[in-house]
């Protein structure tokens, strides 16, 4: 079972996570499009959840949105809404991420990506991205799980995505200067 969630939480310190806001959860099994009977138990318990027969598309879309937002907030040292002043960079990344999604067999996830990223920037304008918060707190980031994964997928498919590769290198350099792990 795969899950994509918009629930808000952050790590205060090791082994302590604080719930920061209710979101929504999409669950799915790429091998079985039918929802399991226990899904109703989650909903009855007050956990907002929905079965998504196309969960992989949702997860790829979330990866792309996070790749377009999180690293730039670190490099520009800003809240999500601060990226509205850097839409040229956001747009260039979205063009490349759309190419990647299509090449990875996820055309639905690629549709209107830039508009969705801008919607997220507006809806979360006062929030700090998780990667920004991790850097600020001196914690390990998810750079390799986001940008690293996307760049590896691009190489596997023979795609040259210069903006994405440059962003990864700039972020890794930024983390090294701060003495933070880059792997």
Where on the chain are the PLM-derived regions?
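Short, charge-rich amphipathic segments
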Residues: 20-37, 50, 79-88, 102-107, ...
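Solvent-exposed, flexible loop/coil residues
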Residues: 10, 14, 21, 59, ...
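Active-site-proximal catalytic alpha-helix in oxidoreductases
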Residues: 56-98, 125-126
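NAD(P)-dependent Rossmann-like dehydrogenase/reductase catalytic/cofactor-binding core
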Residues: 91-183
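Long, contiguous hydrophobic alpha-helical segments, chiefly transmembrane helices and signal peptides
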Residues: 5, 25, 64-74, 131, ...
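Rossmann-fold dinucleotide-binding core
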Residues: 1-58
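Helix-loop-beta segment of a Rossmann-like dinucleotide-binding subdomain
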Residues: 14-25, 74-82, 127-136
């Amino acid at each position: 079972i795969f899950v994509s969630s918009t629930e808000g939480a952050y790590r205060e310190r090791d082994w302590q996570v604080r719930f920061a806001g209710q979101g929504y959860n999409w669950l799915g099994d790429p091998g079985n499009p039918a929802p399991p009977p226990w899904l109703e138990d989650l909903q009855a318990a007050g956990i907002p959840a929905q079965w998504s027969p196309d969960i992989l598309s949702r997860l790829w879309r979330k990866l792309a949105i996070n790749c377009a937002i999180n690293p730039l907030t670190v490099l520009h040292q800003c809240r999500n809404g601060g990226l509205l002043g850097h839409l040229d960079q956001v747009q260039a990344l979205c063009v490349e991420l759309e190419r990647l999604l299509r090449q990875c067999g996820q055309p639905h996830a690629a549709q209107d990506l830039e508009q969705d990223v801008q919607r997220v920037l507006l809806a979360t304008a006062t929030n700090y991205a998780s990667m920004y918060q991790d850097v600020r707190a001196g914690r390990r980031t998810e750079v390799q799980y986001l940008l690293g994964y996307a760049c590896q997928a691009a190489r596997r498919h023979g795609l040259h995505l210069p903006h994405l590769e440059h962003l990864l290198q700039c972020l890794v350099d930024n983390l090294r200067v701060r003495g933070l792990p880059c792997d």
